[in-house]
Design a protein with these regions (language model features):
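Short amphipathic recognition helices of helix-turn-helix/homeodomain-type DNA-binding modules
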Residues: 1-15, 27-30, 38-106, 392-398
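Conserved binding/catalytic microenvironments
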Residues: 107-411
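Short conserved AdoMet
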Residues: 18, 59, 240
């Protein structure tokens, strides 16, 4: 995405606004002022919704939308909410059918099938953080069907069967994550159960550890913090070094949400002592220092230790800001952790930071970001008279259309 093109789009938006104030324009198009401000400075690409509203208001004939589309032309095509809803429903139905068929059948697949599946898992893992979830679902879903079909129709004595089951489990795990971040937690749990069956069937420690971590995440976002912490601790039994820091981080964030200062700090110490993986493994991105700072600062802020948290969360945001390939979900969550730390010092800055996080996922709806943003907006409710807080709360009254797949709450 060219910086020159983004600057030209920003300049054109400023030109159209003319002497009209940003607040007045926001009221006229029923959008929030902070998004308009960032669009005019070129710090982020304006959302499709914003440019469509501006085009309609200024009667440009779609000029801004075309400029924006030119800038994102190299990205994967978007999937409409209705198409994605049908796709998700079909995949979920297939999960139930294929589970019944596993361990039966006759046909034997070729090694080329296995290499294709392994390549897909690796490619999706490597691009997961910078690709909209809606674009990944069809790719992962297609290969998951292939993998599960092979496993379900399989050749019990074939020596490649365990490898196919691991690949099928990795793809089911990826679908679990994708369903979760489109707001479908029930579908996410369905695929996680299937991934867990493959993990148990193969005894693969990497898949087993990853599945455990995702169960902790589902419990955490459901508000069951005690179970989230318990599951994360249980994951250590696999002794899988790649996930040691991640599982400790999941325990820390859950205990922080419970207000358990001693337990949370002990878990953070374990996280910081754990090895940092040098490269990603199939289906799971590696723990990183920036992500560790996000967890540490966010946990301290949950415990009310805002001054201590602030430089840590600021460091995490800076680390992601300076990466051209920063994973957008983690980048946005770093901003949300920083917002939580700012609650003790500057409510306006805290609200604006949440809005920046939402801007980052405006065209890539991500449930983890919207859920945390909703939580922070609720915490800021006593300050609803502050303009930035009022704008944020107004923005969160309606979840993005592409997240409205299930009844997942955002506030």
């Amino acid at each position: 995405m060219g910086q020159d093109g983004r600057a030209e789009l920003a300049a054109r938006i400023r030109e159209l606004r003319g002497d009209k104030g940003q607040a007045a324009l926001a009221a006229a198009i029923l959008h929030d002022r902070t998004a308009i401000s960032r669009a005019e400075t070129g710090t982020v690409l304006p959302s499709r919704d914003l440019v469509e509203r501006l085009d309609a208001y200024y009667r440009t004939g779609g000029e801004l939308g075309r400029r924006r589309q030119t800038l994102i032309g190299g990205q994967l095509p978007e999937v409409s909410p209705s198409d994605r809803r049908d796709l998700l429903a079909g995949l979920a139905a297939s999960a139930g059918e294929l589970t019944v068929r596993i361990r039966t059948g006759r046909t034997t697949p070729g090694r080329s099938d296995l290499l294709l599946l392994q390549h897909t898992v690796r490619t999706v893992t490597d691009t997961y953080g910078v690709t909209p979830h809606s674009a990944l679902i069809p790719v992962v879903g297609r290969h998951w069907r292939l993998a599960e079909g092979i496993v379900a129709d399989a050749w019990k004595s074939d020596r490649l069967r365990p490898a196919f089951r691991v690949a099928a489990g990795q793809l089911a795990y990826l679908l679990c994550r994708l369903f979760f971040n489109t707001g479908d937690t029930a579908g996410s749990a369905t695929f996680l159960e299937l991934a867990e069956e493959h993990a148990v069937g193969t005894g693969d420690p990497a898949l087993s550890s990853a599945v455990t971590g995702m169960w902790s995440t589902l419990h955490f976002y459901a508000g069951d913090y005690r179970e989230a912490a318990t599951v994360a601790v249980d994951g250590r039994r696999w002794g899988y070094a790649y996930d040691t820091a991640v599982l400790a981080a999941y325990e820390a964030r859950a205990l922080g949400a419970l207000g358990d200062d001693t337990g949370a700090m002990r878990a953070l110490e374990l996280m910081e002592r754990s090895p940092i993986p040098s490269a990603s493994e199939p289906s799971c991105e590696p723990y990183s220092t920036a992500w560790g700072m996000l967890i540490a600062g966010g946990t301290l802020a949950r415990l009310g230790r805002h001054e201590e948290a602030l430089p840590i969360t600021a460091g995490s945001v800076t680390a992601y800001d300076t990466r051209s390939d920063a994973p957008y979900e983690m980048h946005a969550n770093a901003l949300l952790a920083h917002s939580r730390a700012l609650l003790g010092a500057d409510i306006t800055a805290a609200a604006d930071t949440v809005s920046r996080a939402l801007d980052m996922v405006a065209d890539r709806p991500t449930y983890s970001v919207w859920a945390r943003a909703g939580e922070l907006a609720s915490v800021m409710a006593p300050h609803r008279s502050v303009q930035a807080v009022a704008e944020l709360r107004g923005r969160l009254r309606e979840a993005p259309a592409m997240l409205a797949l299930t009844a997942g709450q955002t506030s």
